[in-house]
Design a protein with these regions (language model features):
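Short, charged cytosolic
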Residues: 1-14
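Glycine-rich phosphate-binding loop of nucleotide-binding enzymes
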Residues: 18-44, 170-174, 179, 212, ...
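Extended, folded cores of ATP/NTP-driven motor/assembly subunits in large transport
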Residues: 59-561
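P-loop NTPase motor domains
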Residues: 167, 172, 177-178, 183, ...
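A short helix-turn-beta junction within AAA+ P-loop NTPase domains corresponding to the substrate/partner-engaging
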Residues: 647-650, 881-895
Length: 972
């Protein structure tokens, strides 16, 4: 197989259908029921005193439909089983409420049958021996089952305030383990997904093979749960509100309030989040001492969790390790059982429960754990759905014959990413290999004997042939060290109304039908499906039999579910919405625990939206209080509107501008943070450091400078500073009468006079004359702009030729000085059209300066964000040394639309797959591919109307802005 070919996996038909006739065409039970119904209705009809024709017509209208219905069955069940299920539903339908007053008809109990049995058993036993518990545990009554035996101090059992707490089949939570009422131990761990769909074929194969390794050593029964719901943006909103409180500039406060509105809008309409859980139960080993089973279960489950973390890490997944496992498990159950109420944080729910118990005078140390995540009401009176706290649930399952036989890796992404309110539960149960090999051999012999008696024109032939092929496939796999599993899929659909629920169910059926899959509604067994969907690895028996499908280890691994990657850092900035799963992309590039560095490279063709994306990020960083510098070598006017509207400082560096940053100025640096962190260090000469950077400046201005001239220039610069009383002693920088303030700095004109005075440096003076007395004399001034603003734009777009690289160096020199001032403060340097500085037309020393900035800015708590469009020029200088260096030192890359040639050029550098290459060449404006931490995410950039008006460069939109602004300026 070629590296870029995606592998196909096989999910064979069930090789063994017990109780079937005619090669699996009819089920034995259905056939018997059809015969009984046919005789029960047909015999009396045949004895009616009518003509034969009339009796045949009556038979066709009565017996025939019943016989066909019995043969076909209902929802995958026999007619008798369905009728029994229907009457059981009628008998058990009820409304469960918090106060316990609303039961079913005739005053039926609120508890399910298993709970009623447990209650009666407990009443029949000896008086209970109450036990103490931790915060998240409940009392266990004395029972004969020793696996729940504990040795804790006794205390009285507590009746919960919420009657539904008794409905949940959980006894307690201790040591991060769920103790169920049916005497099992269950562990739930949360798994961070990877962006599987945008991985290359080779990477996908690697993930699947690693997942195969895990499945082979995983517990016998595992459940994978994908929970989908509206994103909880409250923590991010709280962060934004705190930043708003600390903001002093009124114009920036307006921007922050606008950002809050945008987040709320996206959160209510589009933002979806997914959480993934791995659930497994304890399987006692033969010979385990029953008296120590609880201790063995806890140790075994904790070991299994660590093993899962190690193996899933090889797949690229991380298993979340909470500080308090009991709290984390309860929070997971809260989000599953109280979907509507879970918009309120779990700690608020805990406070509410504690307040209720205190108000009722109850002991808060004896609160049953189920109180913290029990819903307030469950309506079980409908056959096709149930209602929990006003939210409607419907359950679907994929029947045994509803699976595709050949599937790609990660095919469950279709269901995982289906949309808001669509949850998926995957159940895998490994079967004993010896027993399955024996059954396979028996069934193969039976099927081979049947097919010999069947004509190849018979409808049974294909079914038998498929069963035989499936049997041989499974047998070969088992002989090649694969394991045998039964796979079950249960789909949860939730909606705010019955109409929405029915629409979602219909759409899910269409979606699966389009993929050649079948799905059935769990009619009249919604309660069983609801309990099965809990993370307890407990699929109800009837649902299990209806939906089980045999798979080998490779087929089970193709169901790899952790495929919907999200980037949502509460302390970050919004970039947009994930195009594949509608999750919000909120990135905190300064979080060193997640990102090795904060650098970003933005690549795109002309008109793809590079400048728009760059400015959007800059505005949102400024909104967070981060120091922002923008260097604009082209079209600097595009940055002016946003800068002036948020209180920024716009500095134009050009011969025609009055603004000037003195290139020879030694700026005062705040070393207090360095002294606090590292202690007082050896003093370094600020003059020597400045002169070293000035040498780079003059090498840009005079590329053909000889070594002798460079030495003479060095002497002249030292002399120039000496005239101002500045030496290598840093104390000489300060004014004697005003300590803490620096002396007046020399300007280029002072250096020019010294160079012009010597014949040996006359040539250097003549070249420098352009910046002193010529057309570019604006460079020959003291700094006359405020350099302490939080948002500074350095416009060098009016510089051309050699002055462009000179101006770029002036800008970089300034921002580099500012970046070094405080290592603990976050700052971001944006360089638009970076190819101008490191491209073929640039100078190696200038390119080295940018590359050095990219390599070292991390050490000063900063970020370098480079945007470029001319990729050929970007990778031109020194065979792409500088372009590749910047790309390699940027942990995050944002790819906008690229032309075919540019995309192929960047494919090798970024290791893009063919699918990703195709995607970025077809991006529309506003779409991007974010590549970070080995995950590639297609995102739709989102901005508010205010942000769009501040940074748009589109001609039509600018014309509309000008039209709206005209009446304000000319009211008459």
């Amino acid at each position: 197989m070629k590296p870029e070919e995606f592998e196909v996996y096989v999910i064979p038909p069930n090789f063994m259908e017990g109780g079937t006739l005619f090669g699996g065409l009819l089920k034995t039970r259905n056939t018997i029921e059809a015969v009984i119904l046919g005789l029960a209705v047909g015999v009396p009809v045949l004895h009616l005193p009518f003509s034969l024709t009339v009796r045949v017509v009556i038979l066709c209208l009565t017996a025939l439909p019943l016989v066909l219905l019995a043969l076909i069955g209902v929802s995958g069940m026999s007619l008798s089983a369905f009728i029994r299920l229907f009457f059981c539903f009628l008998h058990n339908r009820r409304i469960l409420s918090r106060d316990g007053t609303q039961g079913g008809k005739n005053g039926k109990t609120l508890l399910p049958s298993w709970a009623q049995q447990k209650k009666s058993d407990c009443e029949a036993e000896d008086p209970p021996l109450p036990k103490s518990r931790s915060r998240f545990s409940v009392d266990l009554k004395q029972r004969s089952v020793t696996q729940f035996k504990t040795f804790l101090q006794e205390e009285e059992a507590v009746q919960p305030l919420n009657a539904l707490a008794d409905y949940i089949p959980i006894e307690k939570i201790e040591h991060g383990v769920i103790y169920t009422r049916d005497h099992r131990y269950v562990k739930v761990v949360e798994v961070v997904p990877v962006n599987f769909l945008l991985r290359s074929a080779r990477e996908q194969r690697s993930i699947i093979y690693s997942f195969i390794s895990y499945l082979k050593i995983a517990p016998v029964k595992v459940q994978f749960k994908a929970l989908t719901k509206r994103a909880d943006i409250n923590r991010h909103l709280d962060t934004v509100r705190r930043e708003l409180e600390h903001e002093q500039d009124p114009r920036c406060r307006v921007l922050q309030e606008d950002y809050l509105k945008l987040i709320r809008q996206l959160g209510s309409r589009e933002a979806i989040t997914r959480r993934f859980f791995l659930v497994f139960e304890y399987e006692p080993l033969p010979g385990t001492k029953r008296g120590h089973e609880e201790e063995d279960a806890i140790a075994s489950l904790q070991t299994a969790a660590r093993t899962a973390a190690n193996y899933l890490r090889q797949c690229g997944n991380e298993v979340i390790s909470p500080e308090n496992e009991d709290d984390a498990t309860a929070e997971i159950l809260y989000n599953i059982l109280c979907r509507k109420a879970s918009s309120e944080p779990f700690y608020q729910r805990v406070k509410s429960v504690l307040a209720d118990y205190m108000a009722s005078g109850r002991d808060i140390n004896a609160i049953p754990v189920n109180e913290f995540y029990a819903p307030d009401s469950i309506d079980l009176t409908h056959g096709n759905y149930l209602c929990v706290d006003g939210l409607y649930y419907a359950y679907l399952l994929v029947p045994s014959d509803g699976y595709k036989a050949r599937v790609p890796a990660g095919w469950l992404s279709l269901l995982v990413n289906a949309g808001d309110g669509i949850d998926l539960d995957v159940f895998l149960a490994r079967q004993p290999k010896d027993r399955m090999v024996r059954k396979l051999g028996q069934q193969l012999r039976i099927n081979r004997s049947k097919i010999k008696e069947t004509s190849d024109t018979n409808t049974d032939f294909d079914d038998l042939d498929g069963a035989i092929r499936s049997g041989y496939f499974l047998k070969d796999g088992l002989s090649n060290n694969e394991d045998f599993y039964y796979l079950n899929l249960l789909i949860t659909v939730t909606a705010g109304s019955v109409d929405d629920l029915e629409w979602k169910v219909a759409e899910m059926k269409k979606l699966l039908l389009s993929q050649d899959m079948d799905v059935q509604t769990c009619s009249f067994c919604q309660e069983q499906a609801f309990l099965s969907s809990l993370p307890l690895v407990s699929l109800e028996r009837q649902l299990y039999e209806r939906s089980k499908r045999n798979v080998l280890t490779t087929g089970a691994a193709s169901c790899y579910p952790f495929t919907s990657y999200e980037m949502c850092d509460d302390n970050g900035i919004l970039l947009g919405v994930n195009k594949h799963n509608n999750s919000l992309i909120i990135v905190d590039i300064f979080d060193s625990r997640v990102y090795k560095n904060a650098n970003i490279a933005i690549l795109g063709t002309s008109g793809a939206g590079k400048t728009f994306t760059l400015q959007l990020m800059a505005l949102r960083m400024r909104r967070k209080g981060i120091q922002v510098f923008i260097i604009a070598p082209l079209k600097g006017h595009e940055f002016h509107r946003a800068c002036s509207n948020i209180g920024g400082q716009f500095i134009s560096i050009s011969p025609a501008s009055q603004n000037c940053i003195n290139i020879m100025e030694i700026r005062k640096a705040d070393k207090s943070v360095d002294d606090l962190l590292d202690g007082p260090g050896a003093e370094k000469s600020l003059l020597a450091a400045k002169i070293q950077r000035l040498h780079t400046f003059f090498s840009l201005l005079i590329p053909d400078m000889s070594h002798e001239e460079r030495q003479l220039l060095d002497d002249a610069m030292i002399c120039t500073y000496g005239v101002k009383g500045i030496t290598h002693d840093n104390a000489s920088l300060e004014q004697p009468k005003n300590p803490g303030c620096y002396k007046e700095m020399p300007i280029l004109g002072d250096l020019y006079e010294i160079l012009a005075a010597s014949p040996e440096t006359k040539r250097l003076a003549n070249i420098l004359n352009r910046l002193v007395n010529g057309s570019a004399r604006s460079f020959n001034q003291q700094t006359n702009v405020a350099l302490d603003n939080k948002y500074i734009v350095l416009d060098i777009s009016e510089l051309t030729g050699d002055l462009l690289t000179v101006g770029m160096f002036v800008a970089l020199d300034f921002v580099w000085d500012k970046a070094k001032e405080n290592r603990t403060a976050e700052k971001a340097i944006f360089v638009d059209e970076c190819w101008q500085l490191i491209g073929a037309s640039s100078n190696r020393q200038a390119a080295e300066s940018v590359l050095e900035l990219a390599k070292t800015i991390r050490g000063y708590g900063g970020s370098l964000v480079c945007a470029t469009q001319d990729l050929n020029d970007f990778f031109a200088l020194d065979d792409g040394k500088y372009g590749k260096g910047i790309i390699n030192n940027s942990k995050t890359k944002i790819l906008l639309n690229l032309e075919e040639e540019e995309a192929q050029r960047v494919q090798g550098v970024l290791h893009l797959s063919e699918a990703e290459l195709m995607e970025i060449t077809h991006f529309e404006r506003g779409s991007a591919l974010i590549s970070t931490n080995n995950n590639n995410i297609a995102v739709e950039i989102k901005c508010s109307q205010m942000e769009k008006e501040l940074i748009t460069t589109d001609r039509r939109e600018l014309a509309e802005l000008a039209q709206r602004a005209a009446p304000k300026q000319h009211p008459c």
